[in-house]
Amino acid sequence: MTRHDAQLYELKKKIEELKKIRGRGTELISLYIPAGYDLSKVMQQLREEYSTAQNIKSKTTRKNVLGALERAMQHLKLYKQTPENGLALFVGNVSEMEGNTDIRLWAIVPPEPLNVRLYRCDQTFVTEPLEEMLRVKDAYGLITVEKNEATIGLLRGKRIEVLDELTSNVPGKTRAGGQSARRYERIREQETHEFMKRIGEHANRVFLPLLEKGELKGIIVGGPGPTKEDFVEGDYLHHELKKKIIGVVDISYHGEYGLRELVEKASDILRDHEVIREKKLVNEFLKHVVKDTGLATYGEREVRRALEIGAVDTLLISEGYDKVRVRAKCNHCGWEELKTMSEEEFEVYKKKLTRCPKCGSQNLTIEKWDVAEELIKMAEEAGSDVEIISLDTEEGQQFYRAFGGLGAILRFKI
């Protein structure tokens, strides 16, 4: 899992949290600031909105909107300039008890540049611009190769994009005999070699930046004859890109139609590639658990300890894992409690804990954060790999049901 993948996973969790929140009136503020936008203009807009909000008829809604705007303006003062990818703020009263005020703020620096500027005060938060980032799927490189032409493309989700089309000067076959035929064949071979070099150079220029960003999940090469095998086996692609080739497919067409045929013919390869990789990881984890090799562990406490001592090779987290870490503290006597629970359990816990169990004070502070996000950050700091395990496979379901969706393959026994 690359840093970009981890950021998208964290973003998904935050969006899920934001979408659950409902305001009692139109009092939840969503603010999107694109990369490079002047923050002083945003502050000016918020001051104008603050002035307008003073005319809201409902006393409660007016109080909540003004409180949210004040909190947003205070937070923006922390920035000298807009973060590199822009900034999204979500602010509002999240208290479920009428008459109570609990103004919360979420500040999200997205993993990809924001290109929208938006201010909205509504009953729900506006998350669509961020959700759009989640809809961008892994990218697969596509190359179709023939003697005389080649096409380079990209598959993102269901969208096939033609990035480059090349043609060659490779001459056709000749009927000449003797030395002329051999000389002509050498010319054809040299022209073919030069053409393949050119294809490789263009592919390297397109795919290497995607590989560096962790977006390139594989490359599929297709063509009607043996030319595609010659291209794959030769030293035309960058060595790191050659490692990403996951399939070589026979196709009949070229150009955009060729890319579409390539994707259609390679549908099993594309589908099985991620599934096989995931199965392999889970099966390796299961093997260590069953054989009791000491090189696998599971459960939050055990995984957390393994991360703390740098023992984790690969952290496995199910996409269904939804635990949160909760810290409750009494501001009067100092009593403190730290627990891990589900979101549903947290809602019950929050309603029940109205007084300090030690001194009876109602002056309590309750903090909550996502366990998966915390463990991913710990893994990154420890140099461990992170893999999100889907619920789409039998192995993924087994990992979630039997181990709670959290485990680790270890570097050494602990």
Swiss-Prot record:
Gene3D superfamilies: 3.30.1330.30, eRF1 domain 1, eRF1 domain 2. GO terms for molecular function: translation release factor activity, codon specific. The keyword RNA-binding does not apply. It is found in: Cytoplasm. Its main location: cytoplasm. It comes from the Archaea. Keywords: Cytoplasm, Protein biosynthesis. Pfam families: eRF1_1, eRF1_2, eRF1_3. GO terms for cellular component: cytoplasm. Belongs to the eukaryotic release factor 1 family. Directs the termination of nascent peptide synthesis (translation) in response to the termination codons UAA, UAG and UGA. Heterodimer of two subunits, one of which binds GTP. This is Peptide chain release factor subunit 1. It comes from Pyrococcus abyssi (strain GE5 / Orsay).
